[in-house]
Amino acid sequence: MKKVYNLIIAVLIVALIVVVAMIVIRYGGNYLNEKEVSSSLETIEEELNKEETQQSESLPELEFKGYKIEGIIEIPKINIKYPIIDHTNEETMKVSITKFWGPQANEIGNYTVAGHNNKDGTMFGKTIYLQIGDKIKLTNLKNKTIEYEIFKIYSIDPDDVSCVESVENGTREITLITCTNGHKNRLVTKARQIL
């Protein structure tokens, strides 16, 4: 009887260790990534300022974790700021916000970005708290920052890509896409340049 009791205790301890390790790996990884994002953003912003003072004709080639970036997105209300990687795939989405579709950052058209909806609030994990009228700042590689105002928030099926279309021709728009409802839907947040 004592052997069975000891075996049950040992199994429970191992299970507890595995669960704790999984939590630490999941959230610890996000925490470390956030620290790296913060330190890299400082370097990226310094490089953008340096390029601006040098009046270079070509855009700087800046990278984050080995991936080229197109700019920086900042949403003050939910306290997020990330470099935008220039393409979307499984690997880049683990690292930062990514370009999904559209022109270069701050150009005419619908610049569409995607990011994970992390439960710890990182990446686009807090976009559910955004409302119509909230602001998004987008800085491109020319160090030009444009402020956008949210005008539409809605949910779509994962296969629906109609959100990449511009709502109004000749305007600058940004669309944020993230998963929601247990990955069954996508939360779409659309914003237009404030003129």
Regions found by a protein language model. Name each.
Residues 2, 6-195:
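Solvent-exposed, non-transmembrane regions of membrane-associated and secreted proteins
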